[in-house]
């Protein structure tokens, strides 16, 4: 039920024995003035009519007319026989637009004595009533308790269509949507703590990005470590024979020797050669380049004090 939707109820009794509740949804958009009149008469919030002639309330009112396969009628709060009635706006109030039609049973409509003579009397259809279109304002529909309407429709009546048994509305009012109870401070604190725990579970330890592949690397590392641990456990197990262990040790020693031989390669000058390719040397190589010899520095010879002598290689 939305916040704008209005619902009312009529508790029915047959010969002072409750037979059920009729719940009605009001069409406040199509007939707001008529709906407000009916709602206020259900709650009795307006009080007494002018001159204290009657209380403006459906509680205790009788269903004074039943026409089988047509309608059940009530709401005469002043006389109780269909000759009276009083609205919250005065004796009568005008018709609203005849938007809705009497096209099906269980529709709520206003009873009147002619145009613009609406008061407190109403009727509920028990079958389609197209002859009422344009004369009576439809403003609601029974949504629960239709079986109660069917019981009333099948009652025995006299020559004036009045039920032989006494049918009375022993209670009426408005249905209000129940609000959720406010939570205590302890419940609110527990709810906040639960939200924090759920938030911690949802947030990963390391934030992800579209370039981040740490999860895949961790999985591959974990799988490789697991596989290596399995190999080690198998190698340490006593079920492995001696020949297998001996061959494995020989292969590992051979691998170490090959790695040592590659690392010990050096050129003619004792410089270690790096890389995996073959070692190549130039066939012609002077110890001292020509341009170095031409620019060699001069040096004084022992016993000579006049001219320096060029240093020859």
Swiss-Prot record:
Q: Which domain of life is it from?
A: Eukaryota
Q: Which InterPro entries match?
A: Cyclophilin-like_dom_sf, Cyclophilin-type_PPIase_dom
Q: Which GO terms describe its molecular function?
A: cyclosporin A binding; peptidyl-prolyl cis-trans isomerase activity
Q: Known EC number(s)?
A: 5.2.1.8
Region Disordered: list its residue ranges: 216-274, 288-313
Ordered alphabetically, the record's keywords are: Isomerase, Rotamase
Membrane-spanning parts:
none
Start and end residues of each PPIase cyclophilin-type domain: 9-174
Which reaction does this chain catalyze? [protein]-peptidylproline (omega=180) = [protein]-peptidylproline (omega=0)
> Which residues lie in coiled coils?
none
A GO BP term, please? protein folding
Mark out the compositionally biased spans (Basic and acidic residues): 216-230, 253-269
Cellular component GO terms, alphabetical? cytoplasm; cytosol
Q: Which PANTHER family match?
A: PEPTIDYL-PROLYL CIS-TRANS ISOMERASE (PTHR11071), PEPTIDYL-PROLYL CIS-TRANS ISOMERASE D-RELATED (PTHR11071:SF561)
The entry's function note states: PPIases accelerate the folding of proteins. It catalyzes the cis-trans isomerization of proline imid ic peptide bonds in oligopeptides. Thought to function as a catalyst in the folding and modification of cuticle collagens.
Instruction: State the family it belongs to.
Output: Belongs to the cyclophilin-type PPIase family.
What is the protein's given name? Peptidyl-prolyl cis-trans isomerase 9
Q: What is the lineage of its organism?
A: Eukaryota, Metazoa, Ecdysozoa, Nematoda, Chromadorea
């Amino acid at each position: 039920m939305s916040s704008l939707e209005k619902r009312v109820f009529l508790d029915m009794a047959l010969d002072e024995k409750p037979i059920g509740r009729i719940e009605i949804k009001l069409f406040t958009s199509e007939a707001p003035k008529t709906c407000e009149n009916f709602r206020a008469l259900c709650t009795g919030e307006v009080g007494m009519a002018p001159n204290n002639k009657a209380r403006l309330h459906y509680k205790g009112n009788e269903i004074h007319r039943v026409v089988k396969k047509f309608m059940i009628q009530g709401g005469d709060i002043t006389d109780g026989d269909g000759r009276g009635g009083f609205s919250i706006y005065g004796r009568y109030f005008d018709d609203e637009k005849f938007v809705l039609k009497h096209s099906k049973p269980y529709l709520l409509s206003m009873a009147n004595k002619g145009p613009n003579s609406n008061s407190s009397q109403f009727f509920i259809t028990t079958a389609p009533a197209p002859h009422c279109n344009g004369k009576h304002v439809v403003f609601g529909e029974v949504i629960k308790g239709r079986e109660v309407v069917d019981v009333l429709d099948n009652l025995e009546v006299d020559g004036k269509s009045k039920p032989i048994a006494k049918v009375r509305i022993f209670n009426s009012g408005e249905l209000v949507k129940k609000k959720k109870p406010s939570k205590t401070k302890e419940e609110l604190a527990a709810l906040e703590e639960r939200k924090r725990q759920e938030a911690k579970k949802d947030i990963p330890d390391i934030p992800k990005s579209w370039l981040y592949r740490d999860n895949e690397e961790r999985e591959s590392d974990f799988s490789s470590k697991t596989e290596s641990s399995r190999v080690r456990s198998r190698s340490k197990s006593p079920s492995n024979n001696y020949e297998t262990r001996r061959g494995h040790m020989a292969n590992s020693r051979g691998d170490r020797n090959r790695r040592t031989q590659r690392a010990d390669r050096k050129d003619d000058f004792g410089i270690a050669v790096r890389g995996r390719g073959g070692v190549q040397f130039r066939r012609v190589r002077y110890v001292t380049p020509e341009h170095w010899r031409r620019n060699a520095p001069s040096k004084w010879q022992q016993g000579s004090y006049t001219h320096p002598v060029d240093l020859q290689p």
